[in-house]
Regions:
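N-terminal glycine/serine-rich phosphate-binding loop of ATP-dependent small-molecule kinases
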Residues: 1-65
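Short glycine-rich, Thr/Ser-proximal phosphate-binding strand/loop in the N-terminal lobe
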Residues: 1-24, 115-143, 147-151
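Adenine-nucleotide phosphate-binding core of ATP-dependent small-molecule kinases
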Residues: 5, 149-189, 196, 207-209
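Generic secondary-structure signature for well-ordered alpha-helical cores
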Residues: 21, 25, 51, 55-56, ...
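Short glycine-aspartate micro-motif
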Residues: 34, 98-102, 191
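Phosphate-binding/catalytic loop of phosphoryl-transfer enzymes
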Residues: 48, 56-60, 65-137, 166-179, ...
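Glycine-rich phosphate-binding/hydrolytic loop that grips phosphoryl groups
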Residues: 84, 139, 166, 198, ...
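Short active-site-adjacent structural elements
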Residues: 109, 199-203
Length: 228
């Protein structure tokens, strides 16, 4: 479901109803609702739409909930809700310390200590965001859709753009993981999620665990701890 800032509560409720009907799921049968929004002005709208559709008050993800984590960062209230969910899932399901990598609009890295403390991480432009920016900001570089690279060195402009994005992201992932591991002084588990993760992982030198459902596992965990 695409986030549109001008949509109303009613419009979101109608769209959610349509999506649930396709599954099919009866909205009135929902036991609970959890909202993980990184668009603050829409959080209340989405929560209200969920209540209108299901009759249930939505649980909104934030750092004050029981997530299984402690937050060793300067401003925990400003940590993205999606990052909280990813980190909560990693702390529950994977050996610690752990670094999660979510390859979305932004590529977000979250570091969780061996005591389940959220230590912070890194945020960089996502692969597709970077490719769009370089095309928009130059005269001769075309827009491209990222694809799994066939070779390391790009033999034409499109391949050079694609391989730069793929192998560049992989090199950054490997390099950051090595540095975090050295700083923590312990073996680091690295878990990747997001639609482009399967494209990036084969380009990495490190062992990377792929978990397509990491975010949803985190939301389920937070709901189990707080929503019932």
């Amino acid at each position: 479901m695409v986030t549109r800032s001008r949509c109303t509560e009613d419009e979101y409720a109608a769209e959610m109803k349509f999506l649930l009907q396709r599954l099919p799921v009866d909205p009135s049968a929902c036991e609970g609702v959890i909202v993980c929004s990184v668009v603050p002005r829409l959080t209340g709208v989405l929560a209200a739409a969920c209540k209108r559709l299901t009759g249930r008050e939505a649980l909104v993800v934030n750092y004050t909930l029981d997530t299984g984590l402690t937050f060793a960062v300067d401003e925990p209230a400003k940590v993205g809700r999606d990052r909280i969910a990813d980190a909560a899932a990693a702390a529950e399901h994977y050996p610690l310390p752990c670094m999660t990598v979510d390859l979305g609009t932004a590529t977000t890295y979250n570091v969780i200590s061996n005591k389940s403390a959220f230590l912070g991480g890194f945020i960089v432009p996502g692969v597709q965001t970077s490719l769009r920016a370089i095309s928009a900001g130059t005269a001769q570089l075309p827009p491209i859709a990222p694809e799994p690279p066939e070779h390391l060195i790009g033999a034409n402009t499109v391949a050079a753009l694609n391989n730069g994005a793929m192998f560049g992201t992989a090199a950054m992932l490997d390099g950051l993981a090595d540095r975090v591991e050295a700083e923590l002084g312990q073996p680091l588990t690295v878990v990747a999620t997001g639609g482009l993760a399967p494209y990036i992982m084969p380009c990495c030198k490190r062992k990377i665990i792929y978990d397509a459902d990491l975010l949803f596992k985190g939301l389920a965990l937070i709901w189990e701890r707080n929503g019932k």
